[in-house]
């Protein structure tokens, strides 16, 4: 399956900024059989099985997180960029490969579950995932691990994290 996935991922140089090599995973969801195979594989992870809930990161993480959530029969919580969630929020700033941003999670969602699997499309520097894990931990929650479709090994994001990382493809 790895070779099929690699074929479906397009690389865009200098996007969204000069010097960035953007890996576009959207080709995967255009191939339902491969997408389903990927979701079945990711859903069977011990990290997913042991978590009470899945937390997916804005925005491409939602695609994979929601499908995994359905397949694994686990609730999904979202971590969103500024101005996207109503209600009382838990917020945190983080650094990107190409700038700075922040993420928010609705506090009412965090009250329901104690252990989480983080799902995203891609792991680069680890800044976004680290932000989510710190948000969860600051609310007394446990991060069991991260599942991503793509991991950019040269950026060494996994080494900044204190929990297991499972990636379907590495570049």
UniProtKB/Swiss-Prot annotation:
UniProt KW Cytoplasm keyword: yes
Entry EC number(s): 2.4.2.7
Gene3D superfamilies recorded: 3.40.50.2020
InterPro entries tied to this protein: Ade_phspho_trans (IPR005764), PRibTrfase_dom (IPR000836), PRTase-like (IPR029057), UPRTase/APRTase (IPR050054)
Keyword Protein transport: no
Catalysed reactions, semicolon-separated: AMP + diphosphate = 5-phospho-alpha-D-ribose 1-diphosphate + adenine
Subcellular location field: Cytoplasm
Highest taxon in the source lineage: Bacteria
GO biological process: adenine salvage; AMP salvage; purine ribonucleoside salvage
Metabolic or biological pathway, per its Swiss-Prot or TrEMBL entry: Purine metabolism; AMP biosynthesis via salvage pathway; AMP from adenine: step 1/1
Keyword vocabulary terms for this entry: Cytoplasm, Glycosyltransferase, Purine salvage, Transferase
Assigned GO CC terms: cytoplasm
SUPFAM superfamilies (UniProt xref): PRTase-like
Molecular-function GO term, any one: adenine binding
A Pfam match: Pribosyltran
Protein's job: Catalyzes a salvage reaction resulting in the formation of AMP, that is energically less costly than de novo synthesis.
Family stated for the protein in its record: Belongs to the purine/pyrimidine phosphoribosyltransferase family.
Description of how the protein assembles with itself and partners: Homodimer.
Name listed for the protein in its UniProt record: Adenine phosphoribosyltransferase
């Amino acid at each position: 399956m790895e070779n099929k996935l690699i074929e479906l991922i397009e690389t865009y140089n200098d996007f969204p900024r000069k010097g960035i090599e953007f890996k576009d995973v959207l080709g995967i969801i255009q191939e339902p059989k491969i997408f389903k195979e990927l979701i079945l594989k990711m859903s069977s992870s011990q990290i997913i099985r042991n978590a009470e809930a899945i937390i997916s990161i804005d925005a491409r993480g939602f695609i994979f997180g929601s499908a995994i959530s359905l397949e694994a029969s686990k609730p999904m919580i979202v971590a969103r960029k500024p101005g996207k969630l109503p209600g009382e929020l838990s917020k945190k700033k983080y650094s990107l490969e190409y700038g700075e941003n922040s993420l928010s999670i609705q506090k009412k969602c965090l009250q329901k579950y104690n252990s989480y699997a983080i799902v995203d499309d891609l792991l680069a520097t680890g800044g976004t995932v680290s932000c989510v894990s710190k948000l969860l931990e600051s609310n007394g929650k446990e991060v069991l691990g991260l599942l991503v479709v793509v991991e950019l090994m040269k950026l060494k994001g996994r080494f900044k994290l204190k929990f297991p990382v499972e990636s379907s493809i590495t570049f």
